[in-house]
A protein has these predicted regions:
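Catalytic histidine-centered segment of alpha/beta-hydrolase-like enzymes
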Residues: 257-266, 270
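Alpha/beta-hydrolase fold catalytic core
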Residues: 1-37, 57-60, 98, 193, ...
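Active-site loop/oxyanion-hole signature of alpha/beta-hydrolase fold enzymes
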Residues: 63-103, 107, 271
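Conserved hydrolase catalytic core segment
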Residues: 98-140
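Flexible "cap/lid" loop of the alpha/beta hydrolase fold
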Residues: 126-161
Length: 278
């Protein structure tokens, strides 16, 4: 009886730990080999990596993340972004995953920088896809570091936007961020499932994160696969400015590619991912 009781208590304990570790994300593991974490960009799910994982899972253990409020994953309370970061660190330590490589698109790439700067010894390498340490500096003219409150006129407008207007806004965004029109519907199907509060407040979390100084703490290799649309010279200038504190960063520029590099230049993208995982 004592053995049975001990077994049940141990099982319940493991279930509680498992649930806590993943409250801000859902993760699926595919393949065997050296561990790789794949983080999607804002509003996207792990489906973003379908073609990539079809190849990588043959040689690597791929941990596919979908964040809270995206796809079918239940939303969480704010702060959203920092909770995800802390939970991924806890997940890595509790599962004793040995130095995974971080691959992240957009917000997922920014998250990768944050993780590597926060825990310099926990990860092996960062491969970021069109991601900056400070998105606000790119998007807000004369950005001075001021924090954006959750409750502001623009966020209220977006929360009150009807579904048709919300989808219309996303259509315009996707047309700009992906040159491959055959993939537009794939992206929109992911974005349309996003919890609205997460979409609005989670984006504010991302804009309020400035890692331009923190990246100096990163001790592992950082490789960036950057888009070049709409203007390569401007893109290069932006990356050089934002990574001034990490001079050892390696940046590869994808010609004729917008933000969704994996869709606009799939062969180039996969070749660079596989090469940099060696």
């Amino acid at each position: 009886m004592k053995i049975v009781t001990f077994f049940i208590l141990s099982l319940l304990s493991s279930l509680v730990t498992f649930a806590y570790a993943q409250k801000s994300f859902q993760v699926t593991v595919k393949g065997k080999g050296e561990p790789v974490y794949l983080f999607p960009g804002f509003g996207c799910t792990s489906d973003l990596w379908e073609e990539t994982v079809a190849e990588l899972s043959e040689t690597h253990e791929c941990h596919l993340f979908t964040f809270a409020g995206f796809g079918e994953v239940a939303p969480i309370e704010m702060p959203w972004f920092s909770t995800i970061k802390d939970d991924i660190i806890a997940y890595t330590k509790s599962k004793k995953i040995n130095k995974p490589t971080l691959i992240g698109h957009s917000l997922g790439g920014t998250l990768s920088y944050w993780l590597a700067a926060s825990e310099p010894e926990l990860f092996r390498k960062v491969i970021a896809v069109d991601a900056l340490p400070c998105s606000a500096a790119l998007m807000i003219p004369d950005y001075n570091g001021d924090k954006i409150p959750y409750d502001n006129p623009r966020s209220q407008m977006m929360l009150q936007m009807d579904e048709a207007a919300f989808k219309g806004m996303n259509v315009q965004l996707v047309q700009f961020m992906c040159k491959n029109s055959e993939k537009h519907q794939t992206i929109l199907q992911m974005m349309d499932k996003t919890d609205r509060k997460t979409y609005v407040y989670g984006y504010i979390d991302m804009l309020n994160l400035d890692l331009r100084e923190d990246i100096a703490n990163i001790k592992i290799p950082v490789i960036i696969l950057a888009a070049t649309f709409p203007d390569k010279a401007t893109v290069e200038k932006t990356y050089q400015a934002q990574f001034a504190k990490l001079p050892g960063v390696t940046i590869h520029y994808a010609e004729n590619a917008a933000h969704f590099v994996m869709y606009d230049q799939p062969e180039w993208f996969l070749q660079n991912i596989k090469q940099n995982l060696k």
